[in-house]
Structures are given as structure tokens and as C-alpha cells.
Regions:
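PLD/PLD-like phosphodiesterase catalytic module centered on the HKD motif
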Residues: 1-209
């Protein structure tokens, strides 16, 4: 993928949203999608997610509890997939991975593998493959919903979400949707990647608070 350069993302075209406004707008936009695809690019190797009991357990250094709590959401994942199927909505996720895996990434790949069991399309690409597109800095965190709106999700240095930049310019949204589709096609399915690279790993060494 050396010749796969990322499209432009003009900052002056985006509308800056607070975290709460982004979450609200995301939910409203997603609910209207019919017979369309969405795309997400994840590049950072560490996030401080909120509202996830499993993530909280990881933060406390409780690895087995973190994995157990992932099991508790299977009914919710199944229901979400059934709703997406009824609406004709397919969600694709591209996960850029650096090695060795951070403790967060090891946990997230367990989470993603489970999501894939319920229909989410997830593929992994090594950071080496995207290096040529990152000469000016890491790729942004991007979500394209239904081909109509793009969110560049913004984070602070600790990995906490602080909001997003909302883009609706047709050319910008279309170019990024096409780019993420190419990254997705070039990546490896989460199932085979997980079996080879993640399943054999011992629990990550975590600091207990």
C-alpha cells in the first residue's frame, strides 16, 4: 500500500463538536441509515474509553474480569446486528496495529473479535503498511456514516475523546469512504489475525491501581 495516500481533510470545512454533541449527532445520523455502508478507521494504540465495565476492569489490572465482562454484552451485540440487518446497514472497521501490542490493543482485539462474531466487518492492517501515508503524522481517527457525514474524532494526549470535527462536503466524505474501503480490502480479517497474533499471548502486564 505504498502508493495509497490519504485524501485531504480540510480543517476549515469541519464543524467542531463537543464530546456530548458528537455522541448525540452520531446516534441521530446512524439511526437514519438505510441500505448503506459505514466505515471506521482506528489508528491510536491506546484509548481511555468511558462507559465500558470491561475497559474499567482492564484499567484496574483485572484481565480475566475484563474478558468475562465482554461476554456479558453478547445479547446487546446480537440485537444491534439484527437491527442493522433490518435496515440494510453494514459497518466496516479498519484497525491499524503496531507491534508489540499495548495492553489496551490486546484487550481491544479481543473485543473486536467478539464484535465480528455478530456480523461487524473488521480487518486489521499493520502500521508498516500505512507508513507511507503518515509522513506528516498518524492517520486521523475517522468515521464515515452511510456515505453522508464524516466525523474526525478528536482525542487528548491521554486518549480521552474530546469531541469531533463534522464534515458533510460530498467530495470529502466520498473520498474518505473510498480510501477506507481500500484499506479494508488490503487488510486481514480479524478472525485469522486474532488466532495467529493475539490468542497465544499471555495476559498483559498491567499496573493495578
Amino acid at each position: 500500500m505504498r502508493d495509497l495516500q490519504a485524501p485531504a481533510l480540510p480543517p476549515d470545512q469541519g464543524e467542531r463538536l463537543t464530546r456530548d454533541a458528537y455522541k448525540r449527532d452520531f446516534r441521530e445520523c446512524e439511526a437514519t441509515i438505510r441500505d448503506a455502508a459505514s466505515w471506521k478507521l482506528e489508528r491510536r494504540q491506546h484509548f481511555e474509553e468511558q462507559g465500558s465495565p470491561s475497559r474499567d476492569a482492564l484499567r484496574r489490572g483485572q484481565w480475566e474480569e475484563a474478558l468475562r465482562l465482554l461476554e456479558d454484552r453478547r445479547d446487546a451485540l446480537r440485537a444491534a446486528e439484527e437491527e442493522d440487518t433490518q435496515r440494510g446497514h453494514t459497518f466496516h472497521r479498519v484497525r491499524v496495529v503496531e507491534t508489540p501490542l499495548t495492553p489496551y490493543m490486546q484487550w481491544e482485539l479481543h473485543s473486536h473479535r467478539q464484535r465480528a462474531e455478530y456480523g461487524e466487518r473488521i480487518r486489521v492492517t499493520d502500521a508498516v503498511q500505512t507508513a507511507s501515508a503518515e509522513t506528516a503524522g498518524p492517520l486521523p481517527e475517522i468515521v464515515v456514516l452511510g456515505g453522508s457525514v464524516l466525523f474526525q474524532v478528536l482525542y487528548d494526549d491521554a486518549g480521552c475523546c474530546i469531541g469531533a470535527s463534522r464534515h458533510t462536503d460530498h467530495g470529502t466524505v466520498s473520498n474518505w469512504a473510498s480510501y477506507l474501503e481500500k484499506l479494508f480490502t488490503a487488510g486481514e480479517d480479524i478472525a485469522s489475525y486474532f488466532t495467529r497474533e493475539v490468542a497465544p499471548l499471555p495476559p498483559p502486564r498491567l499496573r493495578r491501581d
